[in-house]
């Protein structure tokens, strides 16, 4: 391990105050995939390298608060911006059919009443266009549904 590399190994409950009355909090922007991996090197928004060594519990979520064993470093998890495809349909049934076909391919989806969001993928883009759906590329935070294996964690 690098000398001076901060190890983040504790989660704070959202209702707990920051330790030591801290006002200096670093942000840790993570993609949806990165939020499922609870161990490994990451870089904060201000460029500081940190090492996650969190217990294998649930995935990280935007708003989660992390600290080191000595409560000297305070980090707020945020959702990184990701290149996404926004899927819209002329009818609710067409959107439901798109979600069904993407689900059959185990594609991570963020579901909304009038749109689906998925990571940008040229093969899926071609398939969806072939179904007559309206696609727009966008850069947003991505909060996909947990799916059937939500309890499964990577480490």
UniProtKB/Swiss-Prot annotation:
Keyword Cell cycle: no
Example GO biological process: urea metabolic process
GO CC terms of this entry: cytoplasm
InterPro entries membership: UreE, UreE_C_dom, UreE_N, UreE_N_sf
Subcellular location: Cytoplasm
Gene Ontology molecular-function annotations: nickel cation binding; unfolded protein binding
A Pfam family per the record: UreE_C
Highest taxon, organism lineage: Bacteria
Assigned keywords, A-Z: Chaperone, Cytoplasm, Nickel, Nickel insertion
Job of this protein: Involved in urease metallocenter assembly. Binds nickel. Probably functions as a nickel donor during metallocenter assembly.
Family of the protein in this entry: Belongs to the UreE family.
Name by which UniProt lists this protein: Urease accessory protein UreE
Species in which this protein is naturally found: Synechococcus sp. (strain CC9311)
């Amino acid at each position: 391990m690098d000398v001076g590399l901060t190890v983040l190994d504790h989660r704070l409950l959202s209702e707990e105050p920051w330790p030591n009355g801290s006002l200096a909090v670093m942000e840790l922007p993570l993609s949806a995939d990165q939020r499922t991996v609870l161990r490994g090197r990451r870089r904060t928004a201000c460029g500081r390298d940190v090492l996650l060594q969190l217990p294998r519990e649930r995935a990280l979520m935007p708003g989660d608060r992390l600290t080191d064993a000595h409560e000297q470093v305070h980090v707020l998890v945020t959702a990184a911006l990701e290149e996404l495809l926004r899927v819209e349909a002329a009818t609710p049934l067409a959107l439901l059919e798109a979600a069904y076909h993407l689900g059959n391919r185990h594609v991570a989806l963020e579901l909304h009443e009038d749109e689906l969001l998925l990571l940008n993928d040229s093969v899926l883009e071609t398939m969806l266009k072939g179904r007559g759906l309206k696609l727009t590329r966008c850069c947003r935070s991505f909060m996909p549904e947990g799916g059937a294996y939500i309890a499964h964690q990577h480490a």
